[in-house]
Amino acid sequence: MNSPIARTVTCASPSGLHRIGYWEWPCQSGQSQPPTVLCVHGLTRNGRDFDALAERLSHQYRVICPDMAGRGRSDRLANSALYAIPQYLADCVTLVARLDVERLAWVGTSMGGLIGMSLASLQANPIAALVLNDVGPILSAEGLRRIGDYVGKAPSFDSYEACLSYTRTIAAGFGSHDDAGWDMLARHYWVRDGARWRVHYDPRIAEPFAAAGGSGPLSLWPLYDAVACPTLLMRGARSDLLDVATAHDMTQRGPRARLIEFAGVGHAPSLIPDPQIDAVEQFLKECFQ
C-alpha cells in the first residue's frame, strides 16, 4: 500500500509568509512524468480526506493533497479575514508552481471545488480536467446555514470515541460508512492537545464565512461559464448545498459538466466508497488517454 509524503511550501499573504503543508502520493506505475492530480478539501477538512481516493489514483497518477491555510499541518493566518477564496487561490497557484507541472487535474470538494472553479476560469490556467464534488456557482442558503452552525464552535473531547460520535453527527451528509470509513473521516479531523482532542483547524475560519453568509446569495455563474476544460460534477442526491436545478443548469452551460448523483448521500460525497472513487478514476482516464 502506498503512503503519502509530508511536504511544505511557503506562500505569501498581505500579513506575511505562511507555510502550506501538503501530502504527496508518488505514482506507483514507474512513469517518469505521470499526470498530476491536485485534490482540495472542504471548509473544515484537510488533505487527508482524500486518502482512499489518492491511494487508488496513485497507481497511475502523482496525487497532491494540500491542507489549506489554517487546517491540518498548515500555518494559521494572522489575519482571519484572509481565510477566503482569493488567498486560497493564491496559495494553490504557489503550490502548482512548486510542483513544476504545466497541466493537472483538479478534484475539489465543496470549498476546494470553488477554488478549482476560480482557477479554471482564468486564462492560461493549468487545469486540464476538473472534478467538482457537490458544489456549484449557486450555493443553497439551507446548506450554508447548517455549515455555519458548527464551523466556528471548536469543540473538544476527552476521548477519541467522543470525537467519532461527533463526526458522525456533523458529517451525516457524507452518507453511510462502516466503522473503518468513519475512522478515516475522523482520524485527521481531530488532533490530540494534551489530555483533550480538538478539531484540526483554526476556528477563526468561521469569521469570514459568517460575514459572507450574511451578504445574501452570491452567483458565481460568470466563473463557471468561463471554465473550458472537461468537468465532472458529483452530487449527493440529498445535498442541501447544491440543489437539483443548479446541478442541471451546470450540464447545459459553461463546460457542460457530466453529472453523476449518489443516492443516500447529502453534502458531500466522501470519496471513500468504491463507486465514488470509480467515477473519478474513469473520468480522469478519459481525460488523460
Each predicted region: which residue ranges?
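Catalytic histidine-centered segment of alpha/beta-hydrolase-like enzymes
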Residues: 265-275
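Active-site loop/oxyanion-hole signature of alpha/beta-hydrolase fold enzymes
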Residues: 23, 28-29, 52-55, 65-107
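Conserved alpha/beta-hydrolase catalytic His-Asp/Glu region
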Residues: 158-210
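Alpha/beta-hydrolase fold catalytic core
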Residues: 1-37, 59-61, 275, 281-289
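Conserved serine/cysteine hydrolase catalytic core
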Residues: 192-249
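The conserved beta1-alpha1 loop
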Residues: 38-42, 235
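Serine-hydrolase catalytic-loop signature spanning alpha/beta hydrolases and amidase-signature enzymes
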Residues: 42-52, 63
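Conserved hydrolase catalytic core segment
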Residues: 102-141
